[in-house]
Swiss-Prot record:
This is Probable L-ascorbate-6-phosphate lactonase UlaG. Pathway: Cofactor degradation; L-ascorbate degradation; D-xylulose 5-phosphate from L-ascorbate: step 1/4. The gene is ulaG. One of its GO terms (cellular component) is cytoplasm. Belongs to the UlaG family. It comes from Salmonella heidelberg (strain SL476). Induction: Induced by L-ascorbate. Repressed by UlaR. Probably catalyzes the hydrolysis of L-ascorbate-6-P into 3-keto-L-gulonate-6-P. Is essential for L-ascorbate utilization under anaerobic conditions.
Amino acid sequence: MSKVQSITRESWILSTFPEWGSWLNEEIEQEQVAPGTFAMWWLGCTGIWLKSEGGTNVCVDFWCGTGKQSHGNPLMKTGHQMQRMAGVKKLQPNLRTTPFVLDPFAIRQIDAVLATHDHNDHIDVNVAAAVMQNCADNVPFIGPQTCVDLWVGWGVPKERCIVVKPGDVVKVKDIEIHALDAFDRTALITLPADQKAAGVLPDGMDVRAVNYLFKTPGGNLYHSGDSHYSNYYAKHGNEHQIDVALGSYGENPRGITDKMTSADILRMAESLNTKVVIPFHHDIWSNFQADPQEIRVLWEMKKDRLKYGFKPFIWQVGGKFTWPLDKDNFEYHYPRGFDDCFTIEPDLPFKSFL
């Protein structure tokens, strides 16, 4: 059989997916986090891998799914939260635009799996399956009640799950995880299709969503999940020391308010008294595409007048950020390589060839 006859769609997918293979898995495993620091990697959407100086590994909102893949059904799912929000009927054209940079089935060293809320792009059955199959049998799954309900429904033993609500603290080796109030109003209208939201007082946010503060020996990270802007960020900033804050940013389509704007991101950072603010979530959905440079431009306009005590950082999916080593950087660039140029003799026809 010739090569072109032996290749199938399935063999093509297996040979190219996930796009980064186990490259990032290996990088994270090999990373030695220096004392007085923490390292984290952006996994796409609001997915984060955090590693402490003690070698503790936790992942938050790691999602391995996709968005729309076909024009087959031109209508939005009845009762979808975006339909409730804006009274729309047409299919939302939210295609995933970010590659898969971490292979869940290549994860071996992990100390906790966390989710901020139960929306499909923040909690993943494949991650749960991979951790259950390949990692230690005592790795906890930590999240609000709705997330735990999902994990248990997928087959994660109930005793492996920890339900958290605002005010709860969970210790995972040298990382202290504080569950804080979430401000994700979209979560409150994510309801069964036959349930009406109009004229009904929503149930509590605390069972649906939480924000997290990760206190490590080398610094503190605030993860806001899908939270919108809230005045309560200032309360969190009053009560906790926050070094780096992550906020869900995006260009909201007409009639929709689901992501923070550039102004919201700056207000969040100011309220939290953070040192660095990093936007995320803008990478993932084609119809929420946004330019994070807008945040930096607005920051430049306001920073001297308002005396901002923070800086924005523009990240790339799969990239690493180390606190405090990267605190004065404004943008991430992937490693460029070729740092060992001319360690061996070039093989060129003549010296001035290039």
